[in-house]
Every structure is written in C-alpha cells, then in structure tokens.
C-alpha cells in the first residue's frame, strides 16, 4: 500500500436490500463520509459514496446499488489520500493528523529519546508508541515505551522541526 494512503474505514455487513453497507469509521473525521466522497481499496480501486446516512453510519456506493453487489464489499478496508484528508478534514488549533505525528522525534531537554512509531487510542487519550533511540538502548534502556499524549507529558509539537518536546517522558522510559 502506498504510504500516501490512510486507512479510514472498514466496510461492514449489508443493511437492507438496496446495497447499503455499514461503515466502521477508523478515524476522527466522520464528516469525510458524504455524497460523492472518493475512497480507495488496497489495490487503488475507487469507491464513490452515492449516499450516506449519518445516524445509521451506512453508505451506498456507486455501482453497488444491489445487495448481491454490495456483499462483495464486506470487510473491505477503505483508504483515502493524505492530500484528500488535509483538504476534507479541518483541524482545530493544536491538533495534528496521526500520519504527521508518526516519525517525529521525542525530545526532552535536548536529548532525543526516540521516534514515534505508532499511536494507540485508549479510552481517555492517545498513547505515542516510541522506539527508543539506539544510543539509549545500548546503555540498557527499554527498546520501546509509551508516552501519553496529554499536557502533563507533551509540551509542544513541531512538524517543521520534526519533534515533540516532552517533560517526564524520560522517567517513563527509565521505568519501562
């Protein structure tokens, strides 16, 4: 899969007889699911939403307006591009797209602790999954650790400098 693609939904079961399918949103932007929105599968095939019911989270895709055709979509993963995501999903001040945070250095007091490799959501907040820098691993620190994405630990995020400034993240690493 092209690194410019972002997973946004999984198509669930068929609903009714006219080809509607349940959409399981995998992101933070349900507003991207609307009439004429374009998505892709892992092979780059296009899927265009013909209609979307916000309350039921069901979609009808162009060319799949029949239950037998729609059944072929069940369990298909839908993707969009980073470019379309930036265009269609508006962020509030201080918010970032997950794909922009991946790969940023975790820095504390000028020391690079590691690199963000993944982001996991728990019920209350996101957790940054960090691969510890080789220098720290070589002196006995854990290979990976988590940093809660909350003000207590994250001071600032700079996409320009490719870093997240933290406080007390090293304490988490030391106790991992």
Swiss-Prot record:
The UniProt record lists the keyword Ribosomal protein: no
InterPro entries named in the record: PRC_barrel-like_sf, PRC_RimM, RimM, RimM_N, RimM_N_sf, Transl_B-barrel_sf
Subcellular location: Cytoplasm
All residue ranges annotated as the PRC barrel domain in the record: 93-172
GO molecular function list: ribosome binding
SUPFAM superfamilies the record matches: PRC-barrel domain (SSF50346), Translation proteins (SSF50447)
Domain of life: Bacteria
GO biological process, one term: ribosomal small subunit biogenesis
UniProt main location, coarse: cytoplasm
Pfam families linked: PRC_RimM, RimM
Keywords noted in UniProt: Chaperone, Cytoplasm, Ribosome biogenesis, rRNA processing
One cellular component (GO) term of this entry: cytoplasm
Domain commentary: The PRC barrel domain binds ribosomal protein uS19.
Function description: An accessory protein needed during the final step in the assembly of 30S ribosomal subunit, possibly for assembly of the head region. Essential for efficient processing of 16S rRNA. May be needed both before and after RbfA during the maturation of 16S rRNA. It has affinity for free ribosomal 30S subunits but not for 70S ribosomes.
Cited PANTHER family: RIBOSOME MATURATION FACTOR RIMM
Quaternary structure note: Binds ribosomal protein uS19.
Family: Belongs to the RimM family.
The protein's name in its UniProt record: Ribosome maturation factor RimM
Organism: Campylobacter curvus (strain 525.92)
Lineage of source species: Bacteria, Pseudomonadati, Campylobacterota, Epsilonproteobacteria, Campylobacterales
